[in-house]
Amino acid sequence: MMLWYIVAGAGGLLIGYLIANYQINQKLRKAKEDAQTIIEKAEKEANEIKKKAIIEGREEVHRLREEFEKERSRREEELRALEERLLKREELLTRKEENLEKREQQVEELKANLEEKMREVEEKEKRIDEELKRLAGMTVEEARELILEEARQRYEHDLAKLYKEMKEQVEEEAEKEAKKVIAFAVQRYAPDYVGEITVSTVSLPSDDMKGRIIGREGRNIRTFEKITGVDLIIDDTPEVVVLSCFNPLRREIARITLEKLVADGRIHPARIEEMYEKAKQEVEKAIKEAGQEATFKAGVMGLHPELVKLLGKLKYRTSYGQNVLNHSIEVALLAGYMASELGLNADKARRGGLLHDIGKAVDQELEGSHTTIGAELARRYGEKEDIINMILSHHGEEEPMTPEAVLVAAADALSAARPGARRESLENYIKRLMKLEEIAKSFKYVEKAYAIQAGREIRVIVEPDKVDDALAEKLAYDISKKIEEELEYPGVLKVVVIREKRSVAYAK
């Protein structure tokens, strides 16, 4: 039993030993595993710390590199700025050096000029001394005149140069402004224009009327031409006769006379004279109406009735083929437009423009230029001096006193210079016929003179009580000789002196 206890105790000890050993081995194995885990964890943490340290090191290197680059850029920028400042200072020093050299040069020049001035002063002092010695024997007035003459000679050249420069500048500016004003005026006024002709036609009811117009042995046509001073041309043109005359007024009166005769049907010398007087009255009325219409178109009010009538007469006057009344209206409107543009008196400019050729209404009846005659008429009918000056100055016979007078002259030139406004050849022809009549009228005892047949014949009507047959022949000869001396004309010119004595009695 004891052995069993011993064996059991030994077995228990062995089992305890085995169990303890097993537990120890388990603990050792667990400790090894824990140690391995700790080692692995430590290695892992060490790797992570290493990686983190590497990353942080790289970031630090990158940061340090960026800081270095920034610092390097800053330093480079500072160096560039320093270089620029140095360059600027160098340029400044260079300019200062150049300025200094210029100043030195100027000082040298001033020094030279000063020396020259000093020499001039010394010379002037010498001249003044000599002049004073000479002036000692002069009066105060003589000395004053001498000093003024020297001053004039000294500054005359400078004044002339300054005057020339200012004149050129003013003329240039004035030309620009004038072109602008003229263009504005021309744009505002663009009239229709129809050239004037020297013939009129009268329609007939039939060709039989031509024979009645001619009359027995041509007495009717001779009477008509003698009374009207117009050529009556009868040709093969059916149912038409032509009136030819350079004077539009005579031609218009003749046209109305002939139309009345044709309408009446009774054509003989006495009837011709009667119709001629009626036609004159109609034309007088038309002249007045034309004058009133002209003042309305031009915007001119308050003219004397006689001036209005004279304006109407301009309807039957031409200048180089241009109707004088239309020309006057055109000048008035152009002058008014330009005056408005320049801020001047447009009413005054229009008035002067409308009246500038008023003398042409009567210049065939009076001696003198149309401007002189026009000025006298304007003065007679109460126009102011500035308007009279516009009439006289538009052809340069008198200096313009107002800016409006200059505008009237400019408008006159504009109207005449318009393309197609005037015809030189027609005007020369008309002037030759007018001169022909003037030569004949210049002789004593001549009542009327008519140039007919396109200027190839002139008929002169004389006072029958004072001119006998012998004197009539002498008068025809004298007129022909004066025409030869004063006038150029093609071919042969016929001078016919008509002396007609009428005795009238009435049976009651």
From Swiss-Prot:
Keyword Nuclease listed? yes
Q: Is Protease tagged as a keyword?
A: no
Q: Can you name this protein? A: Ribonuclease Y
Q: What processes in GO biological process is this protein linked to?
A: mRNA catabolic process
Q: Which CDD domains match?
A: HDc (cd00077), KH-I_RNaseY (cd22431)
Give the source's domain of life in one word.
Bacteria
Which InterPro entries does this one have? HD/PDEase_dom (IPR003607), HD_domain (IPR006674), HDIG_dom (IPR006675), KH_dom (IPR004087), KH_dom_type_1 (IPR004088), KH_dom_type_1_sf (IPR036612), Ribonuclease_Y (IPR017705), RNase_Y_N (IPR022711)
Segments crossing the lipid bilayer: 1-21
Question: What EC number(s) does its UniProt record assign?
Answer: 3.1.-.-
* A cellular-component GO term for this protein: plasma membrane
Q: What SUPFAM superfamilies does UniProt report for this protein, alphabetically?
A: Eukaryotic type KH-domain (KH-domain type I), HD-domain/PDEase-like
